[in-house]
Amino acid sequence: MINISFPDGSVKQFESNITAFEVANAISMSLAKAAMVAEINGELKDLSTIIENDCKLRILTAKDSECLEIIRHDAAHIIAEAAKELFPDIQVTIGPAIENGFFYDFAKDKPFTPDDVAMIEARMHEIVKRNEQITRELWDRDKAVEFFKSIGEHYKAEIIASIPAGEPITLYRQGSFIDLCRGPHAPSTGFVKHFKLMKVAGAYWRGDSRNEMLQRIYGTAWATKEQLDNYLFMLEEAEKRDHRKLGRELDLFHFQEEAQGMVFWHDKGWSIYNTIEQYIRKKIRKNGYTEVKTPVLVDKSLWEASGHWEKFREDMFALETDDKTLALKPMNCPCHVQIFKQGIKSYRDLPLRMSEFGLCHRNEASGALHGLMRVRSLVQDDAHIFCAEEQITDETVSFCKLLTEVYKDFGFTDIKVKFSDRPEIRAGSDEVWDKAENALKEAVEKAGFTYTLNPGEGAFYGPKLEFVLTDAIGRQWQCGTLQMDFVLPERLDASYIAASGEKKRPVMLHRAILGSLERFIGILIEEYAGRFPIWLAPIQVAIATITSDLNDYALEVQKALIDNGVRTDINISPDKINYKIREFSNQKIPMIAVIGKQEKENKHVTIRRLGTTDQEVLSIEQLIALIKKENEKYL
């Protein structure tokens, strides 16, 4: 007999050599019917797994989050089976589960058409209805290679041949289809009910551009119809909000081939950029930061000393001049250490909070560039806090408080924290890491956050916190970071005089709230769908006249607004007022000041706010006061 422990704390005895499915069936037939996989001693396994010894067991169903990846992995096998049934001459290659779905790569002479994809999706539904049993098989490697060669699946044979000899090969069979896979999988194809094929793209075999191009079909799969519908709605909404599309429509910025990954900011986009910078500058000054400016182009000797040359050389832009190698800085930290080192620093000078809107360049692959979200030239709201070990907790708490205030001002209140602790390869002693990790954990908890652990994902020089925002349509964006560094002050010989009179190394906290301003603006464009709040909008008030004889008064209103720092636009053309209002609304200007005969006589304007038909009559002074009040909350 063996003892099996369950999540509710109960322990039950069973005959040895019982399968996980049989255990589920012994508990209840309904559980066995819903069961997808088993978690045995913390590891996901097929329900057919034989249990020989005492263990901890969870039976998982589609309601458990762990099963979502199983559903997606099953869907990848189902798409491959469907494609092979419809197009027997194609070859299958790889098909993993990915975030939000799955894909499968196929070798096919002619491209898949939209009709082909629709046929494949329909056949997938047929395979689900068949409820084909999915079984795991152990094969000898060489026999598996020969088998796949014999059925014309040469890509699959190549993958298996690259596995070391003697390693067991696991194949999964469903219907007439068989595929190489580690598993686990659900017991049958009937568990994958809610999916949709999304698009076809090219992909090189093994990700190598020297190899042949394959066709990749992407799909999404979910545990329930509601989840699938919500995801498809989110994608539809995301397409409407795409910052690249809105950037063109609202005349904010553009990109072009001659400067890949570099932003051409237009007047309105640059207004948003400068307003955000002004806002952050006010915040950091209030929180005791100094602001510095460091060179963009720096000799490689500094990057060698800091360690960046060895680790990031491929991502840096370098040039030769006067027998020297210079590099555009990819980050600001080594330069900030140089400022810290000017003059003798005492423990009384700490913490020293040094900020910079630093212009950085990173040689991102052209295929990875994506609008404002991934660029080669970027400015970070970067800062480094030089402090003593005993100040780490307080500085982290202060930073978390500042970060929360900033995110709230931009409308983000759902903030998640990820804590990345020590990696296997790291600098510093375990004692130092213990102190650092405990200080960060204590600070996060003091700041009122809970965190999820990313084991082993810290940098080699210290643990880090990542702050993740959830936007209006449920997407998550990692923006803020706080990273502890024991190594750079050592490498660049930064020190301060402690109270005891001895020299000590400061701890360096790398921190950013927005990350890159470019990316954050991209996120904001999509968060607001282009409808910026008044304080941030590039044009705060648009003025529109009903008839041309009101133009002089309209210009008088515009001058008063401009003189008081209000960003304005005006249309005093002969066009109809409804056309003017529609055009300004399409530009997503938050307030439109309509001027008619009565407004001129009373020295008023009639305000229409974006997205409403409500009207409000204000004097020029009242309008200015209203805008100033909004601005002063943030600027």
Curated annotation (Swiss-Prot):
Residues 242-533 are annotated as: Catalytic. It holds the Pfam family tRNA-synt_2b. Zn(2+) binds at C333, H384, H510. PROSITE patterns: AA_TRNA_LIGASE_II, TGS. It catalyses: tRNA(Thr) + L-threonine + ATP = L-threonyl-tRNA(Thr) + AMP + diphosphate + H(+). One of its GO terms (cellular component) is cytoplasm. One of its GO terms (biological process) is threonyl-tRNA aminoacylation. Binds 1 zinc ion per subunit. One of its GO terms (molecular function) is threonine-tRNA ligase activity. SMART domains: tRNA_SAD (SM00863). It is found in: Cytoplasm. Keywords: Aminoacyl-tRNA synthetase, ATP-binding, Cytoplasm, Ligase, Metal-binding, Nucleotide-binding, Protein biosynthesis, RNA-binding, tRNA-binding, Zinc. The keyword RNA-binding applies. Catalyzes the attachment of threonine to tRNA(Thr) in a two-step reaction: L-threonine is first activated by ATP to form Thr-AMP and then transferred to the acceptor end of tRNA(Thr). Also edits incorrectly charged L-seryl-tRNA(Thr). Belongs to the class-II aminoacyl-tRNA synthetase family. Homodimer. This is Threonine--tRNA ligase. It comes from Rickettsia felis (strain ATCC VR-1525 / URRWXCal2) (Rickettsia azadi). The lineage of its organism: Bacteria, Pseudomonadati, Pseudomonadota, Alphaproteobacteria, Rickettsiales. The gene is thrS.
